[in-house]
Amino acid sequence: MKLLEERILKDGHILGDNILKVDSFLTHQVDFSLMREIGKVFAEKFAATGITKVVTIEASGIAPAVFTAEALNVPMIFAKKAKNITMNEGILTAQVYSFTKQVTSTVSIAGKFLSPEDKVLIIDDFLANGQAAKGLIQIIEQAGATVQAIGIVIEKSFQDGRDLLEKAGYPVLSLARLDRFENGQVVFKEADL
C-alpha cells in the first residue's frame, strides 16, 4: 500500500536492528484517515470470503481492525491482555509472547462473542514472529470458528512470522513489508497489494 509505505518513510523511526517506531500514526497516536484507508483495503480484499467477525489484540491492532470491521459491516472483537472481573465465564485464552515488550501475556476473549459459524479475519498492526496471530488463532479455534485470513498493516519480512502462519495454512496479506533496515532507512519488500 503506497500510502502506508510513504507514511512509514516520512514518520517511522528505526530503533536498533529490528524495531520500527510508528507511534505518530499507528501505535500511540492514530491517524484515522490512514486507518480508514487501511480498513477499506482489507475489506475490499476479503469482502468475498464471508467474514463475520474481525479479531485483533489490544492495543495497536484496534484502530485498523475497527475500520476494517466498519468497512465489512461486521463486529470487531479485541483480545484483552489483562483479565478483569467482568470477564468471569466462558473465557477463551492463549499465551502470547510480545517481541516488542519481551513479555508473555495471557490474552482472552469472551467465548460468547465467537461461534462455530463465524468466519474470522485477524487484523494486527505488526507481524514479526507471528506469536500474536498464533495466540488469536488458538482462541478462535477454541470457539470452533474458522480463521479465513490474517491482515497485517506492517510486516517485518526479515522475521519468521509469515512463514510460521503460512506453513500452518493461514493466508497472510500485508500492506507494507519491511525487507530490512539499511543506513537508517527502511527498505521495503514488494507488498501483497
UniProtKB/Swiss-Prot annotation:
It is found in: Cytoplasm. Keywords: Cytoplasm, Glycosyltransferase, Purine salvage, Transferase. It catalyses: XMP + diphosphate = xanthine + 5-phospho-alpha-D-ribose 1-diphosphate. Xanthine binds at L20, T27, K156. One of its GO terms (biological process) is xanthine metabolic process. InterPro entries: PRibTrfase_dom, PRTase-like, Pur/Pyrimidine_PRTase, Xanthine_PRibTrfase. 5-phospho-alpha-D-ribose 1-diphosphate binds at A128, N129, G130, Q131, A132. It holds the Pfam family Pribosyltran. Homodimer. Converts the preformed base xanthine, a product of nucleic acid breakdown, to xanthosine 5'-monophosphate (XMP), so it can be reused for RNA or DNA synthesis. This is Xanthine phosphoribosyltransferase. It comes from Streptococcus pneumoniae (strain Hungary19A-6). The gene is xpt.
